[in-house]
Amino acid sequence: MRNWKTLLASVLAVSMGIGSAVFAQDEPAAPPMTDIPRNETIIINNPEQPATNPGWFNIWVAGSGGGTSNGLHQLVMDTLWFIDPDAGLKGSTYNELATGPAEYNADFTEMTVKLRQGVLWSDGTEFTADDVKYTVETQIATPGFTWSAQFADQVASIDTPDKYSVHFVLKKPNARFHSIFSVRWGGAWIMPKHIFEAQADPKSFDFNPPVGLGPYTLHSFDPNGAWYIWQKRADWDKTAMAEWGEPAPKYVVYRSIPSVDKRLIEMVNGNLDMIHDLSPEGMFSLAKQAPTARGWFPGFPYAHPDPTLPMIIFNSQNPKFQDKRVRWALALMLDPLEISMASYRGAATLSAIAMPPTGTHTDDYFAPLQDWLINYELDTGTSKIKPYDPTVGERIAEMVRPQFGDAVPTDLEAIHKSFGYGWWKKDLKAAGELLTAAGFTKNGDQWLMPDGQPFAFTIKTFTEGVMNRLGTDVAQQWTQAGVQVTAEVAPFIFRDDLPEGTYEAATAWSIETWGGNPDLSYFIDSWHSSYIAEAGKRQPPRNWQRWQDPRLDAIIEKVRSTDFSDHDANVAIGNEFIKLMVDEMPIIPVMSFNVFSAYDTRVWTGFPAAESNPYANIVNNWSNSKYILTQLKPAK
């Protein structure tokens, strides 16, 4: 198959403001816009660096140097279900290539899926059950493909009772097997059988141009990987996405713009419609400079809370952190307002519980649990205290109001969803009582462990950004409270330090949820004690803290045997998990991962908004951001 055309991009001068221009020698090339009408085009910032292998579209091969969030997995790929981290258009779960939910037998050892009829691949070939069967069997037979290990571990057999039905027999019961085909950020994409079966080696096939089930096809791309242009299919109505409407833009451009400042400038100048992420300071600047631009919230704190929970992780295999009184003491040494200001300049959405405060979780978990949290008692060994402060969100709002004025919400519900419901009180007296009860003593201002050695450790953190700021700040707060903590930058924290256990404490995350569904399965199954590696050996994702408890295993086993669609049962399990995590404090939850995504409404309107129509996630490298295109309308 021939390679699709590439367009050589000229070096462009980029306007840096009124009356000045800077020759952008070090910036990736901008896409040529002369051949595509601006009023029919949406231009989106791709957060990936320019692709090192730009013509590679075989998304099933990891580490190939091709792009993923360059439009490939948003506009071209498709699978059985999508789960939005927010409200969704008709609920957060989308039956995409499937016509309805997965159908399991009584013991969850078999799963049947009914498929949409009339869906066409972009080359006109009909999508059928044979494509799903081929995808699974090819993945299993091809180690090195992204989903090979998961399918091989779980699928005993797959057959197609008819052209639009797929039946799986599983190797062991699993009420969440369908989640492999459920997109949160990405998922197990369906392969076009008629294309790949003709390849001698499917792993070395570049899949250029990609043949997809989505409503767009490749128009052109930069040979240096800086931009990709996609064109709407004439037969877009033969895709599953057509159920939610016609995507409005005829063309979609994804641009890699590594410089945060350059992203800001391009949006101010009208050359960018959606930004994946800015720094907090960049977002504040955009709000002042571009009246047609905004973030997820209409005013401060602007950012979209992702269903990811930045936290302080303790290595539970380290004796320093094996007593929950010590972990609780460390939590009570921290000032949540200082954390918010240091990490996000006040734009953090704090969480006292082991759940990101985003999507439907605020209604399913945070609001209903407020009374329990307010009345929660902690025995310090000397006294009983109620450590939860439900006014933290309001206090942060008041703290930033002098600077940001009317941009800061005043409605209590809006404050809770923007800044969080509450957090733990800074209580050095209670922290000291807990440490004393655990056998610690104090020498001057320094806490000593039961063996007489200074209580000191290192906290590993990111190289930059809000996570680095968080790590640096908590280290300073603990040091001021008498625990000598040093923040240490770990450039490959998720690749090396966390899985290898070569850390004492860290700022990172081990909880990621669906966001739009109360089910915990996206992260919690990996927390089962059966997956915990011995000290010195590599830990599989995501239980980086290596914490185990029989009560946690029992919760995980309940999740495995509970129907995904049973909302109330899954909320009950979630509450059980949250309360256990509060009691034991194996990690200190801090906040959601707030992404300063932005959009401009000069060319397109109809974007989702937190306060009025939160139908989709505006963080545009997520595959489910594609639904936004069906709701857009030309601004003029």
Where are these regions (language model features)?
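Detector for C-terminal structural segments
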Residues: 26-27, 33-36, 46-50, 71-72, ...
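Surface-exposed binding/hinge segments that line
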Residues: 35, 114, 148-198, 215-217, ...
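N-terminal lobe/hinge region of extracytoplasmic solute-binding protein
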Residues: 43-106, 137, 211
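A short beta-strand/turn structural motif
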Residues: 53, 57-64, 70, 74, ...
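Gly/Pro-rich hinge or "lid" segments in bacterial periplasmic/extracellular proteins
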Residues: 74-88, 184-247, 251, 261-262, ...
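Aromatic-rich, solvent-exposed beta-strand/loop patch
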Residues: 100-103, 122, 169-191, 210-262, ...
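Aromatic- and charge-enriched surface segment that lines or borders ligand/interaction sites
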Residues: 100-145, 161, 167-169, 266, ...
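Extracellular/periplasmic solute-recognition and catalytic clefts
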Residues: 139, 146, 157-158, 219-231, ...
